[in-house]
Amino acid sequence: MNATTIALIPLLPLASFLLLGLFGKKTFAKSGGIIGTLSLTGSALLSLFTAYNYFFVTGKVDGVYQKIEVLKLQWLEFGPGVSIDIGLLLDPISVMMLVVVTFVSLMVHIYSLGYMKGEERFSIYYSFLSLFTFSMLGLVLSANIFQIYMFWELVGVSSFLLIGYYFNKPSAVAASKKAFIVTRFADLGFLIGILILSFHAETLDFGTLIQRLTDSSSPQLHSAITGGLFGISALTWGLLLVFMGGAGKSAMFPLHIWLPDAMEGPTPVSALIHAATMVVAGVYLVARLFPVFALSCPGALEVVMYVGALSALFAAVIACTQTDIKRVLAYSTMSQIGYMMFALGVSGYGGEHGLGFTASMFHLFTHAMFKALLFLGAGAVIHYVHSNEMGDMGGLRKHMPVTHLTFLIACLAIAGVPPLSGFFSKEEILTAAFHSNKLIYGIALFTSGLTAFYMFRLYFSIFWKKEFLNHKNDLNHIGHIEHKEAAVSPLSEGEGHGGEAPMTMKLPLMILGVMAIVAGFVPFGNFVSSNGEALHSEFHLSMAIAPVTFGLIGIAIALMMYKSESNLPARVSTALRGLYQGAYQKFYVDEVYVFITKKIIFNLIGRPSAWIDKNVVNGLVDAGGMFAQDSSDELSVWQSGKMQGYAIWFLVGVVALVVGFVFMM
């Protein structure tokens, strides 16, 4: 397999980033979008070629897909036998991720040509978008754990730049800082985790590390199991800390607080973050080290399972109460990522036991299609209505037929309605959960009903309910827009009111709509499994009945409550006031963090530290200065400035030296 071809996949977006970053403001001020889109087109085509070549030509040997390191270069050398390499690794999950990242990013690039048209920093936006894509592509191709950490951090920097793109909005600046800081804490855990694992495995290379930490006769595994703190092995600590990094990036509870605020960035950025880059990076990380989790440390994998299930349910409940269209989708992402995580948690290794692993990756693949479609559809609605609030919408199906149809397809897909893509991947996840842990299966089943409810609550509120034009022709009517993204983007200055979105925005919606339908028919188990062997999972009608039933019940309840004007939602929220208020306020997790930060860290740590710094550290420094000052004052009396005095002291010194010399003799 040609290393140059593989290397070009991330290098094309990197070239776009450098070109637009250095010369975009003046030279490519208007053509930056075309340059960025062409670079991603090249990367997407090369990714498809690579996927075909790997899956059907060179990747399988004796019925097993191999890990192929197509490029390996020595980067840093610290001494004989001690070095850090960089390389490009191809295996089923990295190749699958190449296709997902480049395809979704290409759709976002094309969509942004219309959505961001006229933006003052148009080329800079595409520069940041290219950097984001390069970072994620570098991450999924990384051949060793140190290399993945470098690109992991670069993904964080890219998200910081894009979330804070509207830097003149204080809320956007605050959101970008919040995302950066929260994920930094998680990334610290990730760094410590990879140091522990690489120290005991005595390597940074993924293949060697996994082999050594899963071989029962390996001295490295023995070292990792016997070492540790507080009765927990070093291997468990390492994997849990690595998962902490993944939980931060993937917005798992309780490290999810940055995700809703990240909606302050442009809507196409939200599509990329939620569908194909930042939030799926954590799932990819756990999948990359899955053999170690499953074979050597099932306790850590159980933590992944419970955190994923809790996050899925927690986010789904919150999404049922939110009124901002993008925040509903944000919590929807958190819930679906939770599905992927607990699917990994319930999975075994190899054969039918590895169904959860395949189902998780399958859901990552299908979710990328319909979640990108949902966010881009939301962007088209915001572009038309000039608001993020569901209360400012309604009846848009007549005015936005393409957006309406594609959004409906995406809602049906995420609700798990057959025969759309989400149905097949969710069915596999629920099957794996049913055979592994009945409690997790019950949580997943209930969450699937909530998912259908809140997505169709969103759908009916936007496209049905009251007529949009009856109450909303005047932009001055909008006095309570929370997000203000529409007010910042030039596209929101009336361009949308003439009709539906331009073709550059509709084309990605239509393509993603098709993918949301057909992606579920891919025989995913033939290509991606926990051990590289084909997994032929059979469809069981009995397993599909329950989730489909729960989904249809959720849709029916949303239909009764939100298809037309009704006081039923108000009555339900009043009857469930405590739960509703808790969910609407996101169960006060942000307030808990503020309390911990201000009351505990600031008062119990910050204030005492400040007192010690002021009175002890500065006191010692000031005391030293005062001693020097007093000493100089005392000694200054000897500095009379008279030559006679200096001559006398010189003579005294000479005599003292002579006397000392005589005594030494």
Where are the language model's segments positioned?
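Transmembrane helix-loop-helix hairpins at membrane boundaries of multipass inner-membrane proteins
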Residues: 1-7, 22-127, 201-230, 288-290, ...
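Membrane-entry segments of alpha-helical transmembrane domains in multi-pass membrane proteins
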Residues: 1-11, 27-34, 82-100, 138-151, ...
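Alpha-helical transmembrane segments and their helix-start/interface "positive-inside/aromatic belt" motifs
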Residues: 29-42, 177-189, 398-406, 500-513, ...
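Aromatic-capped, Gly/Pro-kinked transmembrane alpha-helices
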Residues: 79-89, 525-542, 561-665
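Hydrophobic transmembrane alpha-helices and their helix-loop junctions in integral membrane proteins
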Residues: 107-148, 157-488
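Alpha-helical transmembrane segments and their membrane-interface junctions
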Residues: 413-424, 428, 513-531, 597, ...
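Glycine-biased, low-complexity coil/linker segments
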Residues: 493-496
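Hard-cation-handling environments
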Residues: 502-555
